[in-house]
């Protein structure tokens, strides 16, 4: 029986406005249309997060800021986000779904020039991503797709939890050593870049 095509309820999930034109164009592996659309939208959201993190890399590589370990940390997280987006696209394809290629807007983080606002931006993005994954998992359950619910929870939501905790710890330590939001805590940023274990471990890989 075909899935009813009513309006979507209010949701925080990224809405792929162009996706409905493609629905029904491929053989689905019991993939509900609303879940397919949401997987498509969430994949784009993850790519946007990867681009934001990549923009932060370039900021901390600038000569007037030059925090190489901080830049390396953001680079590693950007690569992880890109891999996550590709994994979700692979899952979407395996289930017979289709991704609608979209133009991703330039990240609006040019004004970020210090460690604390960069970490706060990253933390906000990950918290939003976590909330979206929770809703996507629940949506999948509600539409009788327990497989998608399980995959989202285990492969995409679960790994975010320790990463959010890590960022919270980094922010606490950054404030403790004197980092500020306006680059006036330059020595604190130097200490974070040189001594923070999570950052030095990244730079040695």
Give the label of every model feature segment.
Residues 1-205:
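Iron-associated oxidoreductase/ferritin-like identity signal
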């Amino acid at each position: 029986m075909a899935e009813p095509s009513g309006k979507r309820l209010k949701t925080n999930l990224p809405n792929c406005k162009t996706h409905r034109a493609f629905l029904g164009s491929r053989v689905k592996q019991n993939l509900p249309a609303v879940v397919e659309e949401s997987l498509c939208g969430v994949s784009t959201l993850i790519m946007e997060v990867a681009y934001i993190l990549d923009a932060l890399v370039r900021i901390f590589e600038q000569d007037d800021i030059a925090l190489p370990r901080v830049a390396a940390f953001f680079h590693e997280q950007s690569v992880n986000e890109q891999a996550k987006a590709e994994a979700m696209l692979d899952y979407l394809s395996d289930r017979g779904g289709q991704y609608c290629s979209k133009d991703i807007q330039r990240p609006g983080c040019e004004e970020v020039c210090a460690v604390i606002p960069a970490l706060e931006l990253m933390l906000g993005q990950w918290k939003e991503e976590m909330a979206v994954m929770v809703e996507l998992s629940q949506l999948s359950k509600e539409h009788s797709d327990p497989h998608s619910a399980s995959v989202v929870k285990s492969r995409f939501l679960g790994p975010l939890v320790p990463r959010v905790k890590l960022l919270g710890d980094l922010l606490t330590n950054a404030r403790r050593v004197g980092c500020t939001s306006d680059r006036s805590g330059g020595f604190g940023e130097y200490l974070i870049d040189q001594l923070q274990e999570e950052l030095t471990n990244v730079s040695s890989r």
